[in-house]
Amino acid sequence: MEIILVTLCLTTLLALLLLKSILKRTTTNNLNLPPSPWRLPVIGNLHQLSLNTHRSLRSLSLRYGPLMLLHFGRTPVLIVSSADVAHDILKTYDVICANRPKTKVIDKILRGGRDVAFAPYGEYWKQMKSICIQNLLSNKMVRSYKKIREDEIKLMIEKVENASSCSPPSPVNLSQLFMTLTNDIICRAALGRKYSSKEDGIDVENIVRAFSALVGEFPIGEYIPSLSWIDKIRGQDHKMEEVDKRFDEFLERVVKEHEDANKDTRSDLVDTLLTIQSDKSALKLIIWDMFLAGTATSLSFLEWAMTELMRNPKVMKKLQEEIRSSSRQGLFVTEKEAEKMDYLQAVIKEALRLRPPAPLMVPRVFSEDVTLKGYNIPAGTQVIINAWAIQRDTTTWGIDAEEFRPERHLDSILDFQGQDFKFIPFGSGKRICPGIGFTSALIGVTLANIVKRFNWRMDVEPQRVQHDLTEATGLVVFRKFPLIAIPSSA
């Protein structure tokens, strides 16, 4: 009897959910909505997403078009996969869709979006962004960190030299090396000193990776509250609590050190923020944004750029020939020298095109009803722009769009400042990544020096090369497996 009763209840519940879904679809049938794959009751199109969401969204867009409507649970989500549609959204409707959708991760770790990247569009966001740019990310401030960048790159080169001088040369974990480099530079620039797990007991590097992974996930409970128990079983809630705890402990320590320091020696971002921002919670979140802007994107680029160079030895050789002939033998390649190297700049652009650090731009949400390409888009619809798909679009980039070919940029004036919508590795519009200048200043000079001083080969068997290219899940996409390579002195 009990089994029959339970079965009857479940059947009734499913029938009601199905009826509700049908009624909702009937009301939206009066609107001219973008093409959409058939969705299941309750979960919508969530079952069609893979761990590498940018790849599954691109596959769907090839079938349903560059402007496609999906449903994550009951939440309508517009997927944009062409430069043409991205232009309309980021130019015509930039302000209307400048807000961010709220998520559990943002509410929990970022205190409802009190930072810059995820704050609601408005006066608070404008003020916080202005503070960050003026005190850390402006062109003037980025230039002032030149000595810090040079010091840390030279330390990195020393570590590689020690490995290459062994007989035989020792393998180098380039992923770890680049993480330490970018972390130490942003720590010195923004916080006044380095922080490391060895000396301070603070593993900033893994906090950055863990946070990026959390923000890039699509938890079931986010879109279907009644199924939030699944997230607990999968350990997502525990991971969020753990990241929040480690995140807050680190930032609390940073702020306290600066509060206790000699007030006459103020010189870094935290000191400046303490004088103008009384809200300690907001202050800590701004500091965290700088880590994401300055560390995660640079690390992702360097990992994938070196991966592609080692997979394409002809490109590596051509790049090394340019660098070695354009700078004095044995000496450090300066930032000015790197900026004038045409093929190096082409390699940077091609790596950003094929492997954008954030394949999916951070979601936005429409605050008003709009008409886009003849389709009705209701207010409340979320927008995800697939930069990864746009930058591999064969109609824009040619039939070799999947290939790593820097030569395509040599006769082009295309840049990555967000003005040309076929190439938006750092986003565009009002929400463009504020760390673009900081990252640009670091990646070129780092790549130039590590490629000039050493010859490189992957420490992996030929049959495992494809496995070695697996991507991690996250807002910023790193390699899933560390990039291990063997250096030899040039």
Curated annotation (Swiss-Prot):
Entry GO CC: membrane
Obligatory cofactor(s): heme
Subcellular compartments: Membrane
Protein origin, superkingdom: Eukaryota
Keyword Cell cycle: no
Family statement: Belongs to the cytochrome P450 family.
Protein name: Cytochrome P450 71A19
Source organism per UniProt: Arabidopsis thaliana (Mouse-ear cress)
Gene name, Swiss-Prot/TrEMBL: CYP71A19
